[in-house]
Amino acid sequence: MNRLAFAALLLAPALAYADDPDAPAPAKDEPAADSTAVAKATPDKPKVNRIYIRLGVTYVKPLAQSNPVELADIDGPASLSLQNGPIAGSGTSIGTATIPSAIVGYVLPVWNNRLSLETVLGPPLDVKFQATGTLRDKPLAPTALGIPTGVMAIGPELGEAKAAPPMVTAVYSIIPTGPVRPFVGLGATVMLTYGAKTTNPVLTEVSQPQMSIAPAPGLVLQAGTEVRITQKIYARLDAKFIAFMEANATVHNIQVKTPDIPLFDTVNVGTAKMSVWVNPLILSGAIGMDF
């Protein structure tokens, strides 16, 4: 009797399943989970917005240091009062500029998205060369053989040009995520100029001396921070210093009037060479989006 009861207990689940097809089947060993299903269940990584654009204003302040202006190719009557070589106490400087600007960057898929490449776009800079020291305050040729020439001091204005300084920096985000994102950067630039011209009224009274400016490369040091305003909009403060940027300008075929010596009327001063360590400080404030 006990054996019959034990057999009935064993057969009860099977008989119940046969009577009710909708009943769950007896437990079996479960197959291994589908790897595809597991992969789908794994949450995706947050999307990285790799392109960013910031629109704002950039202020350029040259921290200029000048060598003395040098004269060359002096000949004829001008040699009576001038000589080739540096003008003692003379110098040149470059004026400041403020322009609208756009900072465009791309976040590289390396170093946990901490590294990006960026550039600054904007209209050409107005580069104004100014005379300093004795070049500004004293006549180029006050006397000739002890006779006053009547040549005037040239004053502060020298010349101007348009500059298009392409710049690329590699930027490292110290804190790549969060509401405040400080960063540092390192890069290179070169000051390329066009449309250079002499604008000084004393130097252009007789003729139009031609000005040429050589390309001036420089090393870019950068630091700044961004503050998140919304999920994709950031405000930026950015400071750059360009080191080792030397601008070399030359003014050719300078002629000046000598009103107190009618015999000559004008004299050919020759060529003036200017060398300025520009080394500008560049400050930018901008706002923009990540894409």
Model-derived features: where do they sit?
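Extracellular/periplasm-exposed beta-strand and loop segments of Gram-negative cell-envelope proteins
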Residues: 63-97, 124-164, 190-216, 244-282
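Short glycine/proline- and aromatic-enriched beta-strand/turn motifs that initiate or cap beta-hairpins
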Residues: 19-106, 282-284, 288-290
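Outer-membrane beta-barrel proteins
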Residues: 14, 37-44, 61, 105-110, ...
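Repeated loop/turn-to-beta-strand initiation elements of outer-membrane beta-barrel proteins
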Residues: 111-117, 178-180, 233-235
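Gram-negative bacterial Sec-dependent N-terminal signal peptides
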Residues: 1-17
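Residues on the lipid-exposed face of transmembrane beta-strands in outer-membrane beta-barrel proteins
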Residues: 55-57, 102-106, 121, 166-172, ...
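Hydrophobic alpha-helix-in-membranes signature
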Residues: 12, 61, 99, 108, ...
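Hydrophobic, well-structured mid-protein blocks that either form specific transmembrane helices
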Residues: 157-189, 193
